[in-house]
Amino acid sequence: MSITRTAVSYYNLGYVEHAEADFREMLDHGCTTVILAVTEFDFDFWRPNIPRIVEAAHRLGLQVLIDPWGIGKFFGGEQVSKFLQDNTGNRQVSALTGEALPYACFNTPSFRDYFARFCLTLAREAGADGFFWDEPHYAFPKSYASITGGAGEDWTCRCPVCMGKFREHYGYEMPKVMNDDVKRFRRREALFILEDTSRRIKELDPAQEITCCVHATLNSYYVTEHRGYDDWDEVAASPYFDVFSTTIVAWNLPRGFFEEITRRTVAAARKYGKQSERWLMGYYRQPEDFAEIDRTVELYESLGVDRLGTWTYRGGYGTVLAAPDALKLWDRIGENYKRVIGKGK
Ligand SMILES: [Zn+2]
């Protein structure tokens, strides 16, 4: 049992020769995989260079996964959404206020088509090894996610499309209070868009590998995120996903939290014959003592995690979300990557 993949995310796609230099630096940091964060703008504007960048990564020996970063604000990420800019409709709607929100409703045919076209076009053109589904989520609630916060009351989505589907399926108007039917409806619809697109990608090329990365929450009696992907069994059981991954945990959260999330991630993945993946926070914040990075990697390793991921290249250096000592953080993560990836060979 050992860690077989070490990934880092990479954005600001543009010039192949610049990406190539960055890929060399990733190799020097023990990375086996680059997760290309392809924004809606990149897709719209830089598309000719995306396959060339993938080719450069392959030439250097990196595996490449494509992350439709922040698409429609359905996935996690800071990027702005062209879909939201170009469409005033097809947005998630607050159950309590009826307001349309700056999040695409991924249950609408319009956004589903947009998402599928984005991914299938890249599956055909880019020549990458697979896709990374990055923190898919409903806009609300998330207050449930906090281990200190209380339960949120508002939720999404009560747009005309969701309300119509709900009525058709359950035979009554979608309530404003989140009952069990609403919970099931939200989860079922949320899974559909990812499964449908994954299936179509694999039909195009069966070798394409899909990682589904959901929020790392306790999902306990007291704390449930209700973002649509809380039932890890449902997600990990999907035949269209190859890797079950759970997101970054902030360095200052208790050790026990890291341990519980990791145990449950590995257990869910193994139960359904999937690879497991856990993440390191390589931007924004850093541990007070960098040795905590070593200890966390050791914990992941000891609990049987198959793959490690880090967000993001160079600790976010140069961005508003850079870690205070971004380059040192990146180096320490790199040292850990090099240590673990040498094992089991
Ligand atoms: Zn909706």
Tell me the role of every PLM-derived stretch.
Residues 7-14, 35-44, 97-116, 175-191, ...:
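The substrate-binding groove and active-site-proximal loops of carbohydrate-active enzymes
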Residues 7-11, 65-69, 132-136, 181-228, ...:
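Aromatic-lined carbohydrate-recognition surfaces of secreted/lumenal glycan-active proteins
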Residues 11-27, 111-122, 223-238, 289-299:
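Short, acidic/polar
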Residues 16-43, 125-128, 237-244, 299-308:
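Catalytic domains of carbohydrate-active enzymes, especially glycoside hydrolases
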Residues 22-23, 35-86, 185-204:
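Aromatic-lined substrate-binding rim segments of carbohydrate-active enzymes
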Residues 66-126, 166-180, 195, 291-293:
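Active-site-adjacent "subsite" loops/lids of carbohydrate-active enzymes
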Residues 141, 194-258, 285-299:
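Substrate-binding cleft/loops of secretory-pathway carbohydrate-active enzymes
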Residues 246-254, 277-344:
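Substrate-binding cleft of secreted/luminal carbohydrate-active enzymes
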